[in-house]
């Protein structure tokens, strides 16, 4: 980061923000970089997401698991009218940037737990959600996490 005074290292607050931010963007190396927005959850110092076991993202990750991930939240918009119309408009963001390696979770029990955490993040009121009912039944087998 260019501005050292903007670096934020409070791990608890970073974790708190990751649990609130609605989506992130994962970038993968391809002939040209490929970046996709993903729903995610943060648990135990790791980023989790799920996806189909087909398509461009899956193929790229299968061939090269090196990824970067960012999630952001706008803090403040600074309009051009600020300081007597002497500014180019800008924004302040809270953002997290992570580089790492993608890994598929093969253990079905852990995969089910992660899928449950993903649903819980986006539907906290869904206290009756079960991985053994309806559309969720067997879904951990057909997806990568």
Where are these regions (language model features)?
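Short, intrinsically disordered, mixed-charge
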Residues: 19, 62-67, 116-124
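Charged, gly/pro-rich active-site loop segments
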Residues: 2-5, 76-145
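Short, structured patches in soluble enzyme cores that scaffold and shape functional sites
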Residues: 28-30, 71-73, 102
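A short mixed-secondary-structure module that forms the rim of ligand-binding clefts
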Residues: 41-78
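Short, well-ordered alpha-helical microsegments
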Residues: 35, 57-58, 129
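An N-terminal domain-cap segment
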Residues: 1-44, 48
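Short glycine- and Lys/Arg-enriched binding-loop motifs that mark or flank ligand-binding interfaces
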Residues: 27, 51, 96
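A generic structural signal for short beta-strands and their flanking turns/coil linkers
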Residues: 22, 36, 45, 63-67, ...
